[in-house]
Each structure stands twice: as structure tokens, then as C-alpha cells.
Amino acid sequence: MLFRSYEPYEDSGEDVTVEFVRNGKIAEMSAICKQTIYGGIEVELSDGNSYHFALTLEDQINLTSLEEMAKDGVAQIPYHADGELCKFYSVADIITIVEAAKSFKSYHVTYFNALKAYIKSLESIEDIAAVQYGMSIPAAYQSDVLRYLISLSANAAVPEE
């Protein structure tokens, strides 16, 4: 099974501390962040179609190699979208894929770090248990980088007039 589901903690009768629940929640959020990144991205390429690219560690290494090929001036670079046959991509398409992958990963790593700081600030088991990956993080726990990345995605969602 690729993805592991997480069940809410059920009291086994043992003493449950805030620290125990906090550490469990941080581990759960870390796993979801990792799964989200590995799940990958949809990227629209120069042919006008969208393709899905997984971002497992191996995929990330492959994309780094492809980026180097593009920088070295290789005009047609072989690669494949998920479930697709290998084909040649232009330098522009490879750069589009790599930049989208970097942005996606940067956002999720930055988001998780802010979420972790927020979780560490919580003092009740109920508040910690209520934390969900993807929730809005209070501004006091958002880094400058996270605020910047959020503003970029908000600006991208606004159609130009």
C-alpha cells in the first residue's frame, strides 16, 4: 500500500501526555507532507496538455539530472510523465517541469515547518488533535518564506484583466 492512513489516537488507558500527542501529530504531519510531495504535480507543457509527474526521491534525482542536461544545451531530453512512454522533451518543457517540482516541494516543506512550529506551541491535547495538514496556519507561525509562497499562489489564482 503506497499511502498509509492515520487513525486518531484512542486512549488505551495509559497516561497520555501533551508531549506524546504532540510528537505523534508532528510525525503524522511529516508523513502527510512527504506523501504529498511524492504524489507529485500536474504540469501544463508547451503542447497545451497537462501531465502528471511523481516526485519520489528517485524522481527528484532524475529531474536534477535533466535540469543539468538542459543547462548543458542538450536540445531534446528523454523523460516520461507518469504512466507514459519515454519521449523527448524540449529544454523549455524540462525547465517548466523542474521549476514546478521545485516550487511544489519548497511550498510543502516550508508549510510543514510552520505547521510544526504551530503544533509545538499548542498546550492541549484537543487543540493538537484538531490540527490537519493543509489548514491555515496562524500568522504568528508563518515564516516570511511561507507568506511569500502563499502570496505567489494567491496572485497566480487571480486572472489578469
Question: Where on the chain are the PLM-derived regions?
Answer:
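A preference for well-ordered globular domain cores
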Residues: F3-E161
